[in-house]
């Protein structure tokens, strides 16, 4: 807070520096002189710029924050479980993570990296696609033990769970394997992969899901591939997207070096 006397002192100092009267004082208060009005008009733009820059600095919790926006399922199932490992490797670099399917604007939303799910269609941006991602059926060990599944056709008599968000669905996958006679009757339908994965973990049926997103559940033995043979279908569904100038930021380079190593441990590449 600034007192009235302090403001008056600053005005007097400015008027003395300029050698001009900026305010006219009377019993009714203080008003701008003609010179004061002209001066205000000239400097108001600069003052606004200073104000905006000040707010940006104040709102920036820490200049080393790496701001990531992610598709929800990737953020929850792949990135979140590994953030503590990143923190241990780079304790001075902090992360702000937001997850949604909303379209973001890098400058407006102050985002360094956007992890997107979908078809790659951003020609003006840097796009690093995760390679070796594949779609295959998963279920819980309890469901697998209680159902005799010897071949792909046996799936037609099982409880298939549908996920709206996957690029490859049951219809695509079954057609790829030339399976006929499917009536597209799902016992459950979810709009997020993490919901479908959780349903399968609970023994509610069989999902067609990405090995990238289901990987941790498999390693923890909450899920298992339905088939021991390779029946997977390739997909390029997840992408690290960013403006060209963001690629030059040290914190972004650090993150990509780290995430590249993490992905390579699991057989993926960017």
Sequence positions of predicted segments:
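Conserved amphipathic alpha-helical core elements
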Residues: 14-15, 223
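Central regulatory/effector-binding core of bacterial HTH transcription factors
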Residues: 63-123
């Amino acid at each position: 807070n600034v007192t009235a006397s302090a403001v008056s002192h600053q005005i007097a100092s400015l008027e003395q520096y300029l050698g001009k009267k900026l305010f006219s004082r009377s019993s009714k208060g203080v008003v701008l002189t003609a010179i004061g009005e002209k001066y205000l008009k000239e400097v108001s733009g600069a003052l606004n710029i200073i104000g905006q820059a000040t707010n940006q600095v104040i709102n920036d919790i820490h200049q080393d924050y790496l701001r990531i926006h992610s598709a929800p399922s990737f953020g929850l199932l792949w990135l979140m479980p590994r953030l503590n490992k990143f923190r241990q490797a780079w304790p001075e670099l902090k992360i702000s993570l937001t997850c949604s399917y909303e379209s973001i604007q890098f400058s407006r939303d102050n985002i360094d990296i956007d992890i997107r799910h979908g078809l790659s269609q951003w020609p003006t941006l840097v796009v690093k696609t995760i390679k070796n991602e594949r779609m295959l059926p998963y279920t819980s060990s309890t469901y697998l033990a209680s159902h005799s599944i010897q071949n792909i056709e046996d799936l037609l008599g099982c409880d298939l769970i549908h996920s709206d968000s996957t690029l490859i669905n049951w219809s695509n996958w079954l057609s790829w394997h030339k399976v006929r006679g499917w009536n597209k009757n799902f016992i459950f339908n979810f709009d997020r992969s993490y919901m479908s994965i959780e349903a399968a973990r609970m023994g509610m049926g069989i999902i067609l899901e990405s090995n990238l997103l289901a990987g941790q559940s498999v390693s923890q033995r909450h899920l298992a591939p339905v088939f021991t043979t390779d029946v997977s279908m390739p997909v390029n569904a997840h992408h690290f997207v960013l403006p060209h100038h963001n690629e030059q930021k040290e914190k972004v380079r650090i993150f990509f070096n780290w995430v590249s190593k993490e992905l390579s441990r699991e057989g993926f590449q960017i």
